[in-house]
Amino acid sequence: VAHDCRLGNHIIMANAASLAGHITIGDHSVIGGLTGVLQFVRVGDYVMVGGCCAIGQDIPPFTFAAGGYRAHLYGLNTVGLQRHGFSADRIASLRKAFDLLFREGHRTAEAIRLAKKEFKGQADVAKILAFMEGTKRGISRAVSLDTEREFDQQV
């Protein structure tokens, strides 16, 4: 862990996970082994990052990221959310928001605008939107649904 990092409560960093300077890791997040996080990156609350990957852009709250050279979003951290007591309805709402923000092909600003309208009053979605609006390094992109399905079959 390098200089000026802010680490949330109840995080797990596996073997040889490395944080460069000025990193923020949210509460209840997991960073897999042999994962490197570049300087100034933010990792949101309840995030799961798989092992052996590099993170160069922000990872939004409640998501799962993985992938060698550059981590991409593979969807929600569903297992982690369930383990922390998130209801099925709450997870379904987050999944719907994830799809709008990352799967429907909107530019980021347009996706945020649409999500603010559709999910008004939903605190979890508001947390994602505020996180995205506060990015300085950009937000990691999602893989295609086909790639996500292939990954799910392997796990």
Segments (PLM) and residue ranges:
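Terminal amphipathic alpha-helical/low-complexity segments used for targeting or macromolecular assembly
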Residues: 68-155
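Structural signal for interior beta-strand "rungs" in well-ordered beta-sheet cores
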Residues: 1-71
